[in-house]
A protein has these predicted regions:
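ABC-family P-loop ATPase nucleotide-binding domain
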Residues: 1-46
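ABC ATPase NBD coupling module
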Residues: 40-44, 99-115, 139, 144
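The feature captures the beta-strand-to-loop junction immediately N-terminal to the Walker
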Residues: 66-68
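Helix-to-loop junction immediately C-terminal to a conserved catalytic motif
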Residues: 81
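Conserved ABC transporter NBD signature motif
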Residues: 89-97
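Beta-to-alpha transition at the N-cap of a short helix in the ABC ATPase nucleotide-binding domain
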Residues: 119, 123, 128-130
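Short helical segment in ABC ATPase nucleotide-binding domains corresponding to the A-loop/adjacent helical element
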Residues: 130-138
Length: 145
């Protein structure tokens, strides 16, 4: 890592929470004050997806999100590209708040600045491996040259 990139931040996540259910905002304070996920589920009928996630990743760093099945890995990644809206928190990419992006800016961000490979992906069975790999570039209009 060079000296220049040590002072830059690529991805910053601050105080990220996700509560799934019909009225997540009503239960946020209780979760922030220590209500555990079992109590939230059993008494309020809501599911705690993420609790107080904070991280910084500098440009060029490689990080791994690891955990058991159902621990929130995919939920976290889907928040970074805003496929899921958080209940609370901040997500900054290159200093820009992803949560403040309008629809057009968000589409551009998703198609040019971020990517995600889903756990259960589907290849086009009638394409070769190379054609499947080229597909994303082709739909963006990138020439093969």
């Amino acid at each position: 890592m060079d000296k220049h990139s040590e002072n830059q931040v690529g991805i910053t996540i601050r105080k990220l929470y996700k509560i799934f259910g019909p009225t997540p905002e009503r239960h946020l304070d209780a979760v922030m004050n220590g209500m555990d996920k079992a109590t939230l589920r059993d008494t309020q009928g809501h599911v705690l997806g993420l609790r107080d996630i904070n991280l910084e990743i500098r440009p060029g760093e490689i990080q791994v999100v690891m955990g058991l099945s159902g621990s929130g890995k995919s939920t976290l990644i889907r928040h970074i590209n805003r496929l899921i809206e958080p209940t609370a928190g901040e997500i900054l990419i290159g200093g820009k708040n992803v949560l403040e992006m309008g629809a057009r800016e968000l589409r551009r961000f998703r198609s040019h600045s971020t990517a995600m490979v889903f756990q259960k992906f589907a290849l086009f069975p009638h394409y070769t491996v190379l054609e499947n790999a080229e597909y994303g570039l082709r739909v963006q209009g990138v020439s093969g040259k």
